[in-house]
């Protein structure tokens, strides 16, 4: 624990920017508003007060808290003006406001409500922070330190010996300079911690104030931050507690005390505990609100592992978090956190508890801790003792006090983090302290958890914290798993987990705790019904350490999924029946600790990414405050029978206040259980890879967070048979062709039904091509090449479906032209008129025509078909339809000419018998086309409008320069032209 304060210090400044997002803290916006709003008006006074409080002995802490509160009142009055100035001095104001909020909130937190700060902060001032996150971070960081007794030492260092008498501006400047100096060392930790504070305190104000909120949160949670500075934004909530805990070497105790009760603060064990605990309490209160929103989700991740937590933490504060937790919070409401706030005023404190993952390495843990922070306030409810938590205390305590939080829907903040905290062992070293504290200061416990062990990596076990304690009433069912101590301290006992997992653990339980300290928390817990009203998800999920990962994953998922309304289709049919049950925590016995940690990390990550919604039923349940009820199905899948093997997941009762009783929490299954059930969760857990600790959920809408993107699955799978482009086309095409067929010949009466729609088909070449392709698919039967007799599938043939290759089509054209030369020559006028007027060259038309011709006697069509097939087989994708039509018309005309000329060595053609000088452009085209290897070049002659006279004047350089004809063909053409001249 001693080491934690230092980390916390360093962490203070780090998180500002990331925390900004945390602002999501809106969940507790009502409660927290007071904290933040006050800032702008009287920053200077607040700074002075803070400095004084920092430097004064613990005995005078109460006075300074009162002073802070008075300053806060002034701030509220000045709030409007201050807001205007906000952008200018937002960072300073934020930090000051954060400090004040934390201090004042600490006082209120003493009272069950801790409403004073919250009430006053109800205003949206939290926004102040946003303007200049960096300065705000620095300031808030220093403030946070000052606000928490644990941080006092750090604060003193930062502020130096600044006398309380310094002018506000001086103090601010000094703070800034110190912050800047401090930043390098504590950059990550300090800044981050600050941000978390901001988020918690400013959560009330608004997301835009995220930065401010974060700063406030950081400030209030600064102590916690110190321990787990890294997680900055998310961490803010937990940070407050964690900082408190970390800073107080005995912080666990002191922070616990502070959490339990402001009064206990004075009781806090040793050192700065008294002041720190006070600050902690304050911070917790303010941050709780803020944190609650962000933290409640992130907490889930915290338990997974610090890295996951970090991600979650950051994401909640940032857009990602938005996806994971924050999304849900905001969507469902940041209130999910609010849920934790469920007691309208107390919620803030309850959030504080959340998780405090800082137990993990400072950097990663910070993120988690912040996430957890939301739960921090709840920590008091965390009754699980560290040891117990190890076993499976981790309950997903997501008891959002529904009544209070505006966005109760998200109530379900599961904070499976606790679950994740499988690492009780790691925390065991720390745990002992927490355990003692636990018994001594159950109230403080939550705080202790927070501090607990920012240094600890992933002692998930503490995570257990959550559940049981929170619901005293619920505890009986679920807490039993936790342990007597849990039940005893149900309201406060988050401390056990404090150690490494504490961060994770913290998150969950804190959420449950309402703003009220232990008492309120107990009442909330005891009254899951009340919570459920608001959609309280207060449920303790005790998970064996092994399961922790699963719980964690679930928690994480929920948050990730939360963002989307996520109608979790999961019907917790089994559980819903027992409203009281929600508190019930099921202990998972099958999971192995080792599995848990890994899984927590992986699951969290994986869950977050691919199947967040599915990831864990609990997560889903939590994630969708609105749909939590739906989520009950998860429980159903798990089946209470499996309870022994499953950890109870926090299930939020439907938003409906009517659901007084909290639906039974979804069960978190141990690895074994989860795996067995994984089958039942069809698509929900697909990407999770059947992580052992996954709960079974059948959400209607699956939401995945992958690479930072939230991906929602559709209610129905995409059709696999064909590409989406082709699915609609057949209808269009068929009608198109049918129209043509019917118009030309009344074949296939069935097609006539579709004819009406055919005319409306778009003229784009793409559609024509698609239509033709679809036709080919429709005629998938084997086709026989009319020239070479080769058999093949329709898709391998040319568009005309008559020839397997272009060479066959061309050869067939030649043979047909010879066969029908005479008959065609006789009918030339008709054919030409057809080509000019009647025939439509569009691809689909050609295909339709060929289709019709195939069905008609072959006497007349064969030659034309031949031409059509050739035309169709050479699609010009880049040309417009009009151009293609005109080109095809000309091609047909020229072909007719060619056919007249070519058959019988062109002796039969009148053109051949005439002087080349009187040839028309078409005659020249036919002549060039008849030359070997010059078929493609013939079109160029027509495009250049070369008639007989021009042809005789052509030279190689003309062909090469004007028509880009290669030298070989140009020489051949010129040789033939010369022969014409000679003849």
UniProtKB/Swiss-Prot annotation:
Bias kind Polar residues: ranges: 127-139, 225-257, 274-283, 365-383, 477-489
Cellular component GO terms, alphabetical: nucleoplasm; nucleus; PcG protein complex; PRC1 complex
Stored PROSITE patterns: SAM_DOMAIN, ZF_FCS
Entry-annotated residues carrying Phosphothreonine: 609, 614
Subcellular location: Nucleus
Note: The hPRC-H complex purification reported by PubMed:12167701 probably presents a mixture of different PRC1-like complexes.
Name of the molecule in the record: Polyhomeotic-like protein 3
Gene from which this protein is expressed: PHC3
């Amino acid at each position: 624990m001693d080491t934690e304060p230092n980390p916390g210090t360093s962490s203070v400044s780090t998180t500002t920017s990331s925390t900004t997002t945390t602002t999501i803290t809106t969940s507790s916006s009502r409660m927290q508003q007071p904290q933040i709003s006050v800032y702008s008006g009287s920053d200077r006074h607040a700074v002075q007060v803070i400095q004084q409080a920092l430097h004064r002995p613990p005995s005078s802490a109460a006075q300074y808290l009162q002073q802070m509160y008075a300053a806060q009142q002034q701030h509220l009055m000045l709030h409007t003006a201050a807001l205007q100035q906000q952008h200018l001095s937002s960072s300073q104001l934020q930090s000051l406001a954060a400090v004040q909020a934390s201090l004042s909130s600490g006082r209120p937190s003493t009272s069950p409500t801790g409403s004073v700060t919250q009430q006053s902060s109800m205003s949206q001032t939290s926004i102040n922070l946003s303007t200049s996150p960096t300065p705000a971070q620095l300031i808030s960081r220093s403030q946070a330190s000052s606000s928490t007794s644990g941080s006092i030492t750090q604060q003193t260092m930062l502020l130096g010996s600044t006398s309380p008498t310094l002018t506000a501006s001086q103090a601010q400047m000094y703070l800034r300079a110190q912050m800047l100096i401090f930043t390098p060392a504590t950059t990550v930790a300090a800044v981050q911690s600050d941000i978390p504070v901001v988020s918690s305190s400013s959560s009330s104000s608004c997301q835009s104030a995220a930065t401010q909120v974060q700063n406030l949160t950081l400030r209030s949670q600064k102590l916690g931050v110190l321990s787990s500075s890294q997680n900055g934004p998310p961490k803010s909530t937990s940070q407050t507690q964690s900082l408190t805990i970390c800073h107080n070497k005995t912080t666990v105790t002191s922070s616990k005390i502070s959490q339990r009760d402001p009064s206990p603060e004075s009781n806090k064990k040793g050192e700065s505990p008294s002041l720190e605990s006070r600050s902690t309490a304050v911070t917790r209160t303010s941050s709780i609100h803020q944190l609650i929103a962000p933290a409640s989700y992130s907490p889930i991740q915290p338990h997974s592992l610090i890295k996951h937590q970090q991600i979650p933490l950051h994401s909640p504060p940032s857009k990602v978090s938005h996806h994971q937790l924050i999304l849900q919070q905001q969507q469902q409401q940041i209130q999910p956190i609010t849920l934790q706030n469920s007691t309208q005023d107390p919620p803030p404190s309850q959030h504080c508890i959340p998780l405090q993952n800082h137990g993990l390495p400072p950097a990663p843990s910070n993120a988690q801790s912040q996430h957890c922070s939301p739960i921090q306030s709840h920590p008091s409810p965390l009754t699980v003792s560290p040891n117990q938590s190890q076993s499976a205390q981790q309950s997903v305590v997501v008891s959002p006090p529904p009544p209070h939080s505006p966005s109760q829907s998200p109530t379900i903040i599961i904070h499976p983090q606790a679950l994740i905290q499988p690492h009780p062992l790691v925390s065991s070293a720390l745990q002992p302290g927490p355990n003692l504290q636990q018994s001594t200061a159950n109230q403080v416990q939550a705080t202790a958890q927070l501090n607990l062990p920012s240094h600890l990596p992933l002692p998930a076990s503490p995570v257990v914290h959550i559940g049981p304690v929170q619901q005293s009433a619920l505890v009986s069912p679920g807490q039993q798993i936790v342990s007597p101590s849990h039940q005893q301290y149900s309201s406060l006992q988050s401390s056990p987990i404090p150690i490494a997992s504490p961060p994770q653990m913290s998150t969950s339980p804190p959420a449950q705790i309402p703003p009220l300290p232990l008492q309120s928390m107990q009442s909330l817990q005891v009254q899951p019904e009340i919570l459920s009203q608001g959609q309280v998800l207060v449920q303790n999920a005790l998970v064996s350490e092994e399961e922790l990962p699963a719980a964690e994953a679930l928690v994480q998922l929920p948050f990730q999924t939360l963002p989307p309304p996520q109608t979790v289709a999961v019907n917790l049919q089994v559980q819903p029946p027992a409203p009281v049950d929600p508190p019930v925590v099921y202990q998972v016995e099958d999971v192995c600790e080792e599995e848990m940690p890994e899984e927590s990390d992986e699951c969290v990550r994986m869950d977050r990414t691919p199947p967040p919604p599915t990831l864990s039923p609990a997560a889903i349940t939590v994630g969708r405050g609105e749909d939590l009820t739906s989520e009950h199905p998860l429980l159903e899948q798990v089946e209470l029978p499996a309870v022994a093997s499953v950890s109870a997941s926090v299930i939020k009762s439907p938003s409906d206040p009517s659901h007084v009783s909290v639906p039974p929490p979804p069960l978190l299954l141990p690895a074994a259980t989860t795996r067995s059930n994984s089958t039942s969760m069809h698509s929900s857990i697909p990407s999770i890879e059947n992580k052992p600790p996954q709960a079974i959920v059948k959400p209607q809408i699956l939401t995945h967070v992958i690479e930072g993107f939230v991906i929602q699955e559709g209610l129905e799978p995409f059709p696999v048979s064909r590409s989406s482009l082709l699915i609609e086309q057949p209808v269009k095409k068929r009608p198109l062709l049918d129209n043509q067929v019917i118009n030309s010949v009344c074949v296939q009466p069935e097609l006539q039904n579709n004819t009406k729609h055919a005319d409306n088909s778009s003229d784009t070449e793409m559609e024509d091509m698609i239509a033709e392709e679809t036709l080919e698919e429709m005629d998938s039967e084997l086709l026989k090449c009319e020239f070479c007799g080769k058999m093949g599938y329709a898709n391998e043939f040319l568009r005309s479906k008559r020839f397997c290759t272009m060479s066959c089509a061309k050869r067939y054209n030649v043979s047909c032209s010879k066969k029908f030369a005479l008959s065609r020559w006789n009918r030339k006028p008709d054919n030409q008129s057809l080509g000019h007027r009647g025939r439509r060259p569009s691809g689909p038309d050609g295909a339709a025509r060929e289709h019709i011709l195939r069905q008609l006697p072959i006497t007349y069509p064969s030659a034309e078909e031949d031409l059509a097939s050739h035309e169709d087989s050479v699609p010009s994708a880049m040309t417009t339809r009009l151009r293609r039509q005109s080109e095809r018309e000309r091609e047909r005309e020229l072909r007719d000419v060619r056919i007249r000329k070519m058959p019988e060595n062109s002796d039969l053609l009148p053109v051949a018998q005439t002087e080349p000088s009187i040839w028309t452009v078409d005659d020249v085209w036919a002549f060039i086309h008849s030359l070997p290897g010059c078929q493609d070049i013939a079109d160029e002659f027509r495009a250049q409008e070369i008639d007989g006279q021009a042809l005789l004047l052509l030279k190689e350089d003309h062909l090469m320069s004007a028509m880009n004809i290669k030298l070989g063909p140009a020489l051949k053409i010129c040789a033939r032209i010369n022969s014409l001249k000679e003849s």
